[in-house]
């Protein structure tokens, strides 16, 4: 996971002088896979005022076992600010897991990263801390999208939830407004 992120970071820095503001007005609908299970993913983000944005992200996962499937839902809701290609966001998170019984945990997270693009290609790379279950987890998020037109595109992303949920790959359709 280290090397693709370094390549993405170098691509950001090499095109920083031509980078445009990241387009935060979008909705991603797709599937996720963490190597053990699969599920649906849903993200919606929107500019609010000036360079501020709000974002909600939900990742559902179901892992098959020999007895009963393990179902989990990870979500976070953030408010952020972008200046040039640098962005910061903070908010709350929720982690629900069900096997024979259900547990839910809530916490907070803060992330810092780079976001931008030019033309039809947009990319984002961020890292931060997730406080959940009385522990701190490293969270890394990288995604890229390609727009076919002003309203429709495709998105590909990786979210690394450390030991909490592993590396989750996401592939989906991006709707923009």
What do the predicted segments below correspond to?
Residues 46-48, 79-83, 114-118, 144-146, ...:
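Residue-level signature of outer-membrane beta-barrel architecture
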Residues 25, 36-40, 69-75, 82-84, ...:
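Residues that define the transmembrane beta-barrel architecture of outer-membrane proteins
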């Amino acid at each position: 996971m280290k090397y693709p992120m370094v390549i993405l970071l170098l691509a950001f820095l090499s095109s920083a002088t031509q980078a445009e503001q990241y387009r935060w007005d979008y909705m991603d609908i797709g599937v996720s896979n963490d190597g053990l299970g699969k599920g649906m993913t849903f993200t919606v983000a929107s500019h609010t005022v000036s360079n501020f944005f709000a974002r909600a992200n939900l990742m559902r996962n179901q892992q098959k076992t020999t007895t009963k499937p393990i179902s989990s839902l990870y979500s976070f809701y953030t408010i952020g600010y972008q200046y040039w290609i640098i962005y910061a966001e903070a908010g709350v998170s929720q982690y629900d897991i069900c096997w024979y019984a259900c547990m839910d945990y809530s916490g907070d997270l803060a992330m810092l990263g780079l976001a931008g693009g030019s033309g039809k290609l947009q990319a984002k790379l961020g890292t931060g801390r997730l406080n959940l279950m009385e522990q701190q987890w490293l969270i890394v998020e990288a995604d890229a999208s390609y727009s076919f037109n002003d309203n429709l595109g495709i998105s590909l992303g990786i979210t690394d939830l450390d030991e909490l949920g592993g590396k989750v790959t996401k592939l989906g359709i991006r709707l923009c407004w």
